[in-house]
């Protein structure tokens, strides 16, 4: 089993698909990595030679930010927006949609479950 960027790639899948198991690599990036490493995209992971795995690993290290580094960069970008106090940062801080979606209805995923309506206790009856 090939291990690239700290991820065990599935043995039976084509390398183009297996690379997509790495956070930060999608279909287009996987194809580009295979092309730059001179590896056929239809090759199964189990059929890769050690040299091909090494070339893929080096290509990823040079060209793409993946896994922990990418997650760290994204979280730092969000933290920077929140520290600036800009509109996008405020939306992140409040847990609301950031990209202009409506919130009067919908946006349940971002806002979380509904908060129930809290009613005041009935006043005691006059004597």
Curated annotation (Swiss-Prot):
| Cleavable signal peptide | none
Q: What's one Pfam family the UniProt record gives for this protein?
A: Ribosomal_S13
- Keyword Ribonucleoprotein listed: yes
Q: Which GO terms describe its biological process?
A: translation
A Gene Ontology cellular-component term: small ribosomal subunit
Q: Where is this region: Disordered?
A: 95-127
List, alphabetically, the HAMAP family matched: Ribosomal_uS13 (MF_01315)
Q: How would you summarize the oligomeric state and partners of this protein?
A: Part of the 30S ribosomal subunit. Forms a loose heterodimer with protein S19. Forms two bridges to the 50S subunit in the 70S ribosome.
The UniProt function text for this chain reads: Located at the top of the head of the 30S subunit, it contacts several helices of the 16S rRNA. In the 70S ribosome it contacts the 23S rRNA (bridge B1a) and protein L5 of the 50S subunit (bridge B1b), connecting the 2 subunits; these bridges are implicated in subunit movement. Contacts the tRNAs in the A and P-sites.
Listed name of the protein: Small ribosomal subunit protein uS13
Write down the species: Anaeromyxobacter sp. (strain Fw109-5)
- Corresponding gene? rpsM
């Amino acid at each position: 089993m090939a291990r690239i960027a700290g991820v065990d790639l599935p043995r039976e899948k084509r390398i183009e698909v297996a690379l997509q198991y790495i956070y930060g690599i999608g279909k287009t990036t996987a194809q580009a990595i295979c092309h730059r490493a001179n590896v056929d995209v239809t090759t199964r992971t189990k059929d890769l030679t050690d040299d091909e795995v090494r070339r893929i690993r080096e290509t990823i290290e040079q060209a793409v930010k993946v896994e922990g580094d990418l997650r760290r960069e994204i979280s730092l970008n969000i933290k920077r927006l929140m520290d600036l106090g800009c509109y996008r940062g405020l939306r992140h801080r409040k847990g609301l949609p950031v990209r202009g979606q409506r919130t009067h209805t919908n946006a349940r995923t971002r806002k979380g479950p509904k908060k129930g309506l809290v009613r005041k206790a009935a006043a005691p009856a006059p004597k």
